[in-house]
């Protein structure tokens, strides 16, 4: 296969990968989603991630129909990545994509939840041991040696169920043999590494010391001349000196000494050069013997090594996702095939949870659902128009539904106590973008309408469409979008402040509302974020005006806010500010 057939790989990138990896290795790295291999070849991590997402999930990536949907997808991966136990696990999380069918989603879900349950039942000390083993694996770039050593360390922790079972079943003796072989063969270039063979290490040490003496031969001559005068004495003194200083066998030193020399310096230099050459040959010979033995040992353990790399990589990935699931109390969604729906009970927005905000769980649904009894949304309505208070969590609810749908179709657990999800082909999430520019309106319509008109199932999540055009036209366009969504048998939630202008809605659509309930003792707006079904929400501006009146320090400014209070309903404002002084005399002050 040509590299340029992959999305995002042009002539320049193809040439780089071909040069650094070769075509076959590059193709293998792309097909196996190996970010590490591509970044070592010179690609940036971000570029490698984009290429691999398309290579491994090109068709499923069409689910991300708008920029805002893609932003939610990336934010979810960022949250999951924070819980990665190795860099390679983080790389694999970054290239997770929506899956093409329900069977694949269920399979990944089961793996993640099995890992979650195993991790949750593991005591803290064992968790620390497991994380330390993964950290050790991460510290040497995730190579085969590191994977084998990590497998051995994980076996020592005693964890042997779930994602750790493939590691626990590996033969420890084979892993030990493989670790020694890999450690020996991981020297620079073709060099056998230090520690692989005691004899080889000894020869290398002797060679290094002799080479150091070659560089300081005049000092050696001077020292020997102080001890010996006659040639035979000088020869014996050199043998004793080199044996003492380098540990080289006396016979090898005598064999290296020249029979004739012009003077003492020539004799010492010739002997040292000859001895260094002899040791160099001995090192090469021993290294070749050791390398051959190590390669035989590694070949015998090859199957175990490959299994260890795969098992450790998979365990790292699923432990990372398990930690993500536990951190946010994620649960298994129920996939439904006989009806179209997205329905959640006790759903929570992950972005708010990550920020440390207090999150009110909400229950919501569109389509035909079968949520457990309780505050159950109406069933059968394919489209909902969501209205209500400013800062009432309407956009957050859209984002939460987007998170649930995306995570489910990625085969990951979702942030809800219960969730029913029908699979869709496109998620059209569109945030509020305030601009009356005609270009913005056109680009918005081009992004939200085609997924509806294309063949396939669509989830529409559209926020305050009126923000991009004047109210009259916005109401007409939004009514058209709602109608089109119903006619195309899609699902949708549309946030708007123009509910009254949208009547009458199509039969399969309803209106829901979020209500502001008052001000707290600290004059913070209190909102019930749980939508009330089949009713128009109220933004209750008197609460906002009440807060402005109470907080106004300047008398003139307060008078202005009191005028606004009369406009929105002075009685309501007085009721809200029951603890605040409200009289003409106060405002005159």
At which residue positions do the language-model features occur?
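Conserved amphipathic alpha-helical "coupling/scaffold" segments
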Residues: 1-223
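Short, ordered beta-strand-loop transition motifs
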Residues: 158-159, 231, 235, 253-254, ...
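Extended, EK/Q-rich alpha-helical coiled-coil segments that serve as long dimerization/scaffolding arms
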Residues: 171-185, 219-277
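Generic structural signal for well-ordered, non-transmembrane alpha-helical segments
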Residues: 201-215, 232, 277, 306, ...
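Coiled-coil heptad-register positions
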Residues: 211, 218-232, 239, 280, ...
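Extended, charged coiled-coil "arm/hinge" scaffolds of SMC/Rad50-like chromosome-maintenance ATPases
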Residues: 247-320
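Charged, amphipathic alpha-helical linker segments immediately N-terminal to NTP-binding catalytic cores
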Residues: 307-359
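ATPase nucleotide-binding head domains, primarily ABC-like/P-loop NTPase cores
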Residues: 343-589
